[in-house]
């Protein structure tokens, strides 16, 4: 299993683990992204997904270039789309 991490708009990455040690709770993910979550399935062999703020573009959150590159490389978003705000990448099985 790959590590779980946050990608911040400034490009920094931080490894994270679920508070309960097993699965990420909804409230935990909402706190990290700053609002309601949107789950973006990544098309990779590691069964990962990207969690972002569902309303991030409406809130004018900062563009997250690193997360956008990952989402584009996985063909998880359209070419004209982009990611804003904090992005969390976790194993899909750790979504509660």
Indicate where each model-derived feature is located.
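Detector for the mature cores of small, proteolytically processed
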Residues: 1-32, 36-96
């Amino acid at each position: 299993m790959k590590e779980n991490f946050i990608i911040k708009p400034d490009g920094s990455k931080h490894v994270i683990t679920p508070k309960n040690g097993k699965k990420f709770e909804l409230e935990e993910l909402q706190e990290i992204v700053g609002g309601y979550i949107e789950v973006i399935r990544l098309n990779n062999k590691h069964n990962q997904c990207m969690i972002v703020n569902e309303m991030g573009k409406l809130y004018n959150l900062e563009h997250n270039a690193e997360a956008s590159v990952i989402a584009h490389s996985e063909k998880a978003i359209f070419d004209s789309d982009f990611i804003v705000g904090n992005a969390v990448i976790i194993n899909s099985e750790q979504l509660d």
